[in-house]
Amino acid sequence: MSKHETKMTRWYAKTRYPKGFLMEEYLALPRGKTNGKRLMDGVIVFRKPFVKRKLIKGERVVVVQSKHRRLGMGLIGQVIVSRDLVERLGVKVMKSVGVCTEMDTVMHRMLRKHPKCRAVVYRAA
């Protein structure tokens, strides 16, 4: 995650879920013989976290992926796949969000067809 994207992920967690706890660079899928590791820019949990703790089955979470550019197919794919990867861990994904610097209305309409997937535009303070 770049320094811009870190700032964007933290902004989203702080403004939308101030009572949640952001776990940055969350490992949703470790590297294996036939797959690469998959990191989420952020996972927001609502129980006090331990340092890089594992998610608890049944726990409600919000998954965050950030890109310092306009909403596009790459970020949309990350939002959808991130939701599915984290759900495989047995948690309840309330929302999977892509944070971007500019909205693309056509792409956002496509993203909204997928349950629990949304995009928001980063507003620097």
Language-model-detected regions and their locations in the chain:
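Charged, terminal alpha-helix-loop-beta segments
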Residues: 1-125
